[in-house]
Amino acid sequence: METPKLSVEAIEKGTVIDHIPAGRGLTILRQFKLLHYGNAVTVGFNLPSKTQGSKDIIKIKGVCLDDKAADRLALFAPEAVVNTIDHFKVVQKRHLNLPDEIAEVFRCPNTNCASHGEPVKSRFYVKKHNGQTRLKCHYCEKTYSRDSVAEA
């Protein structure tokens, strides 16, 4: 029997973010500043996936994401799974939950919002409505679909 070949090399210890929708890997790298840790980061783009057709994957050597950071990922890749690796084995597999609130990640699309002209940090309340992720601005109280809100 032939041993399966990995598309992206295994890591001994760290974090694997799997099942990222194809094309979202770079956004996650940038938004979560995963390259700033100074650790080896391996990224696979448009890899074959049985459930998604194609996917991205990110492996970060020597870094473990906390629950808060992992759940922030749900805003970019709701179906992603965060695996904690130790001695080349998955020791924890986390399915993501949307956070109740998110700050300093997105910009409010409302140009009249106080978050644009005042020295305040953007802040949104996160809700799921009819299967869609919605963000309500803390300052202007307008609600937007996740896709219509730009990254900060």
UniProtKB/Swiss-Prot annotation:
UniProt entry tagged with the keyword Metal-binding: yes
Family matches, as Gene3D superfamilies: Aspartate carbamoyltransferase regulatory subunit, C-terminal domain, Aspartate carbamoyltransferase regulatory subunit, N-terminal domain
How is the cofactor bound, as the UniProt entry phrases it? Binds 1 zinc ion per subunit.
Q: Which residues are Zn(2+)-binding?
A: C108, C113, C137, C140
Among InterPro entries, the record links this protein to: Asp_carbamoyltransf_reg_N, Asp_carbamoylTrfase_reg, Asp_carbamoyltrfase_reg_C, Asp_carbatrfase_reg_C_sf, Asp_carbatrfase_reg_N_sf
GO terms for MF: metal ion binding
Q: Per its UniProt entry, which superkingdom is the organism in? A: Bacteria
What's in the GO CC field?
aspartate carbamoyltransferase complex
Q: Which cofactors does the annotated protein need, by name? A: Zn(2+)
**Keywords linked to the UniProt accession:** Metal-binding, Pyrimidine biosynthesis, Zinc
Enumerate the Gene Ontology biological process terms.
Answer: 'de novo' pyrimidine nucleobase biosynthetic process; pyrimidine nucleotide biosynthetic process
Task: State the function annotated in the UniProt record.
Answer: Involved in allosteric regulation of aspartate carbamoyltransferase.
Quaternary context: Contains catalytic and regulatory chains.
Against NCBIfam families, the record matches this protein to: ATCase_reg (TIGR00240)
* Similarity comment: family membership: Belongs to the PyrI family.
Q: What's the name of the protein?
A: Aspartate carbamoyltransferase regulatory chain
